[in-house]
Amino acid sequence: FGKTLNMSMLKCFFEIGTDQSLFEGLYISKNKALCDAYMGKYPVISISLKGVNADSYENARSLLKRIVMEEAKMHRIIMSGNRLDDIDKAEYMSLVTGDMGEDTLVYSMKTLTALLEKYYEKKVIVLIDEYDVPLAKANENGYYDQMVLLVRNLFENVLKTNSSLKFAVLTGCLRVAKESIFTGLNNFKTNSILDEEYDETFGFVDDEVKEMLHYYGQDTHYETV
């Protein structure tokens, strides 16, 4: 646990227009150079695929379209002014009307990154929480092959050779084989909660485990836990 909270924190830190007072007094605020370079400096696309829980491929695809559409609506400011031309604005409207064919859907996030980069003149950060849920539910309900193809195409388009992408962070509970949906991605790095680099970022830290075991009178089970 802690995945969604961390993704929310990343969005709040990087996103243009963020409330910088949220980080006042925190450890990261002591690194002024880092904050000046990154805090509130980038457009951010942030979606959670937790809601793609369906008993059929058609319903799952509809839920995914809804998630993309709602995220695109969050960036409607790009329709203001003249930074985007009429063709760009038509592309944006195709993402928010809900009338999205599968070809539009698999390019939807890449399209949105391109539009955001053009408007802000900044590379775009992409955050995808619970990326594995659609595949887990598809496996349970017998449409895994269809869903893995859709998710692979969506991810490859936005994450691979996308000149508008600054970087992306994905979180999930299951270790989905890299070959299934991340084929050919460059600079792909996998971390688990067992990695020392993040062992104090997710779940409980060591002192918290000891405190809970002591509270329940289970101190002798520390090594097992």
Give, region by region, the residue ranges found by the protein language model:
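Phosphate-binding site recognition
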Residues: F1-V225
